[in-house]
Amino acid sequence: MTLSKWILSFGLSVCLIVSHPVSAERIKDLANIQGVRANQLIGYGLVVGLDGTGDQTQQTPFTVQSILSMLGQLGVNLPPGTNLQLRNVASVMVTATLPAFAKPGQQIDVTVSSMGNAKSLRGGTLLMTPLKGIDNQVYAVAQGSLVIGGAGASSAGSSVQINHLGAGRISAGAIVERAVPTVLGQGEYINLELRDTDFTTARRIVDTINSRFSYGTATALDGRVIQLRAPLNNNQRVTFISQIEDLDVIPAQGIAKVIINARTGSVVMNQMVTLESSAVAHGNLSVIINTQPIVSQPGPFAQRGETVVVPQSQIEVRSEEGNLMLLPGSASLADVVKALNAIGATPQDLLAILQALKASGSLRAELEII
């Protein structure tokens, strides 16, 4: 494989973060206000109106039980032992995210996912479904027509499907019924929480806030939490938080890190990765096993005998020579890529090479395998 072809193939499997000067970011993009958070909601419901693509009720007894319970609440009582054969109903799980400061009457999006063996939820309508929080209290009620991003068709045993048919969304499909109390800090203090723990970034945020307001306004409690002295009046506190979020801070550069996905062979490096001078020899080892059955029959005039099939295997081991190659020290990400391309290894082989370079101390980066 030529160097140009290797660079092309390596580029398809290795995602690189291009080195750019670090620019200032808003504090809003680096930290969150402690206590201002979303909450997850979940509920169990029924989707009706499907075109024969719903649950097979004989295999999903919980669907039948849910239908009988719903009909009973609506005043429809079926005789005991009634065998329902329905194909236009599906049991689903409904999930939603309740944003911070959401008030009763506001609408939120919901995601509807099939729970049974329904083939498709396309064209279905979700019936009224209460959505509960972790405390088992109802915070929203969902209902509406599903929007499915996939499509499919089947006939005479053949089928075709595009994207996924077992899940969909309802935009503004739930109405908030209960608000979650959110308190902006305790007393005169509120806390900022950095999204990534970093002492340098925390110090820079503190210095920026104190220079904008007054010394003592911000105090770093640790590498993640910054305490702010804020006004007690709600309106003034909101204005204060807004001004804090719009301040620009240059975040600290992260540690050198190489992310390896062992399943796909993908490798991601950040701009801090460097490489010390090292020598690498890499050879491919392949084992080829070829098995052929050989039939052994008795002679034409033998009185007794049986035909026997004996497998005959041939095992061949091939080892390609790997020349020792010098990798010069690299101070930039582009130089690291150029040095790794010079080895000529496949992306899967590159995983082993990076681990060996890290073990030898030549790769100045933290390896993380996902």
Curated annotation (Swiss-Prot):
<protein>
    <recommendedName>
        <fullName>Flagellar P-ring protein</fullName>
    </recommendedName>
</protein>
<keyword id="KW-0732">Signal</keyword>
<dbReference type="GO" id="GO:0030288">
    <property type="term" value="C:outer membrane-bounded periplasmic space"/>
</dbReference>
<dbReference type="GO" id="GO:0009428">
    <property type="term" value="C:bacterial-type flagellum basal body, distal rod, P ring"/>
</dbReference>
<feature type="signal peptide">
    <location>
        <begin position="1"/>
        <end position="24"/>
    </location>
</feature>
<dbReference type="InterPro" id="IPR001782">
    <property type="entry name" value="Flag_FlgI"/>
</dbReference>
<comment type="subunit">
    <text>The basal body constitutes a major portion of the flagellar organelle and consists of four rings (L,P,S, and M) mounted on a central rod.</text>
</comment>
<keyword id="KW-0975">Bacterial flagellum</keyword>
<dbReference type="GO" id="GO:0071973">
    <property type="term" value="P:bacterial-type flagellum-dependent cell motility"/>
</dbReference>
<comment type="function">
    <text>Assembles around the rod to form the L-ring and probably protects the motor/basal body from shearing forces during rotation.</text>
</comment>
<comment type="similarity">
    <text>Belongs to the FlgI family.</text>
</comment>
<dbReference type="GO" id="GO:0005198">
    <property type="term" value="F:structural molecule activity"/>
</dbReference>
<dbReference type="Pfam" id="PF02119">
    <property type="entry name" value="FlgI"/>
</dbReference>
<keyword id="KW-0574">Periplasm</keyword>
